Amino acid sequence: MTEVKLDFDKQGGLVPVIVTDYKTGQVLMLAYMNEVSYQLTLETKQMHYWSRSRNELWHKGATSGHFQHVKSIKTDCDWDTLLIAVEQEGAACHTGAYSCFFTDIYDDNQDR
């Protein structure tokens, strides 16, 4: 594992995390991590976030059983955003949908 120093200072102590399905590449959700949730994720290989609405640490799946198991972690060129591929148990979205991104606003590829 490559050691990097993520830039948590740029966005008030948080970094955005884009979470994808490691098999399909489908985007599952966007969440945020602080340094503590990032370290917990590295240590446990399960996703931990910072809940901005509840203002607390959030271990994904601890309540719902819908755990996310880390398969790979990448950072962007500025070291202030993460892209994490996971093995998803159940739904990623609190609505029960597999992905949080299920509402089409525009899709020019309707004939796919």
Curated annotation (Swiss-Prot):
<dbReference type="InterPro" id="IPR026660">
    <property type="entry name" value="PRA-CH"/>
</dbReference>
<keyword id="KW-0963">Cytoplasm</keyword>
<keyword id="KW-0378">Hydrolase</keyword>
<dbReference type="GO" id="GO:0004635">
    <property type="term" value="F:phosphoribosyl-AMP cyclohydrolase activity"/>
</dbReference>
<dbReference type="GO" id="GO:0008270">
    <property type="term" value="F:zinc ion binding"/>
</dbReference>
<comment type="similarity">
    <text>Belongs to the PRA-CH family.</text>
</comment>
<protein>
    <recommendedName>
        <fullName>Phosphoribosyl-AMP cyclohydrolase</fullName>
        <ecNumber>3.5.4.19</ecNumber>
    </recommendedName>
</protein>
<feature type="binding site">
    <location>
        <position position="80"/>
    </location>
    <ligand>
        <name>Mg(2+)</name>
    </ligand>
</feature>
<comment type="pathway">
    <text>Amino-acid biosynthesis; L-histidine biosynthesis; L-histidine from 5-phospho-alpha-D-ribose 1-diphosphate: step 3/9.</text>
</comment>
<dbReference type="GO" id="GO:0005737">
    <property type="term" value="C:cytoplasm"/>
</dbReference>
<feature type="binding site">
    <location>
        <position position="100"/>
    </location>
    <ligand>
        <name>Zn(2+)</name>
    </ligand>
</feature>
<feature type="binding site">
    <location>
        <position position="77"/>
    </location>
    <ligand>
        <name>Zn(2+)</name>
    </ligand>
</feature>
<feature type="binding site">
    <location>
        <position position="78"/>
    </location>
    <ligand>
        <name>Mg(2+)</name>
    </ligand>
</feature>
<feature type="binding site">
    <location>
        <position position="76"/>
    </location>
    <ligand>
        <name>Mg(2+)</name>
    </ligand>
</feature>
<feature type="binding site">
    <location>
        <position position="93"/>
    </location>
    <ligand>
        <name>Zn(2+)</name>
    </ligand>
</feature>
<comment type="function">
    <text>Catalyzes the hydrolysis of the adenine ring of phosphoribosyl-AMP.</text>
</comment>
<keyword id="KW-0460">Magnesium</keyword>
<dbReference type="InterPro" id="IPR038019">
    <property type="entry name" value="PRib_AMP_CycHydrolase_sf"/>
</dbReference>
<comment type="subunit">
    <text>Homodimer.</text>
</comment>
<keyword id="KW-0862">Zinc</keyword>
<keyword id="KW-0479">Metal-binding</keyword>
<keyword id="KW-0028">Amino-acid biosynthesis</keyword>
<dbReference type="InterPro" id="IPR002496">
    <property type="entry name" value="PRib_AMP_CycHydrolase_dom"/>
</dbReference>
<dbReference type="GO" id="GO:0000105">
    <property type="term" value="P:L-histidine biosynthetic process"/>
</dbReference>
<dbReference type="Pfam" id="PF01502">
    <property type="entry name" value="PRA-CH"/>
</dbReference>
<dbReference type="GO" id="GO:0000287">
    <property type="term" value="F:magnesium ion binding"/>
</dbReference>
<keyword id="KW-0368">Histidine biosynthesis</keyword>
